[in-house]
Design a protein with these regions (language model features):
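P-loop NTP-binding core
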Residues: 1-263
Length: 263
């Protein structure tokens, strides 16, 4: 059964969409079956996967409000090799419409339940706020991957996010946990970045991924061509970093599965 991970941070511009697209493609490169869900009304993960958000017949919005089933909405990312549940501007209305629906915070979880056996990983790209859409992602998820820049104000925002994850786990999704913190746009030449990184390691320990994602021009260029960096420039530092992250994620899952088995 698929592990479902929400890629979330209430702060924008930290690399959520970049991580979602490139981690999905890198997991495919390790022969895993992957579904990427774009839950951000901007639809950047959709466009970055090579799917035109302006020509969609069905999207994640239609799925959430019950106007289509999953099979009618899913697209395929040719360059990424993963399946995609796309988003467009219609999703902006989802915030209001969902508030009026029964089981509003569980719509995504219920929609995914019948197809979790079809995938190894399901990754959800969340909007940069604790909205009804993000709440749906966190209720559907097994864990949260938090991309973040190593800067001063990021630590303050991280504390709020961790508190919100704990609250959702207590009230709506007992299995929800922080899967890992991912340092993005990382430049080890800057002393502030190293200081913040050390604080993260001290506070979060093994929850902090060993892999760091460097600042890399290829990572910035790839979305404009509608492809993951692995398809755009597989030898770039960005591509190699996300391959390393995929490997680290798979190893963690393997260890976690072994630890959960009865002796």
């Amino acid at each position: 059964m698929a592990k479902v991970f929400a890629i979330a941070n209430q702060k924008g511009g930290v690399g959520k969409t970049t991580t979602c697209i490139n981690l999905a493609a890198s997991l495919v490169a390790t022969k895993r079956r992957v579904l990427l869900i774009d839950l951000d009304p901007q639809g950047n993960a959709t466009m970055g996967s090579g799917v035109d958000k302006h020509t969609l017949e069905n999207s994640v919005y239609d799925l959430l409000i019950g106007e289509c089933d999953l099979a009618e909405a899913i697209q395929f990312s040719e360059h990424g090799g993963y399946q995609l549940l796309p988003a467009n501007r219609d999703l902006t209305a989802g915030e209001v419409v969902l508030l009026e629906m029964q089981m509003k915070e569980s719509r995504l979880r219920n929609a995914l339940a019948p197809i979790r056996e079809n995938y190894d990983y399901i990754l959800i790209d969340c909007p940069p706020s604790l909205s009804m859409l993000t709440l749906n992602a966190l209720v559907a998820a097994d864990g949260v991957i938090i991309p973040m820049q190593c800067e001063y104000f990021a630590l303050e925002g991280l504390s709020d996010l961790v508190d919100n994850i704990k609250r959702i786990a207590e009230l709506l999704n007992p299995q929800l946990k922080i899967e890992g913190l991912l340092r993005t746009m990382y430049d080890p030449r800057l002393s502030l970045i190293n200081d913040v990184s050390a604080q993260l390691k001290e506070h979060f320990g093994d929850q902090l991924y060993d892999t760091v994602i460097p600042r890399n021009i290829r990572l910035a260029e790839a979305p404009s061509f509608g492809m993951p960096v692995l398809a755009y420039d597989k030898t770039s530092r960005g591509a190699l970093a996300y391959l390393a992250l995929a490997g680290e994620l798979v190893r963690r899952q393997r260890r976690s599965s072994k630890a959960a088995q009865p002796t």
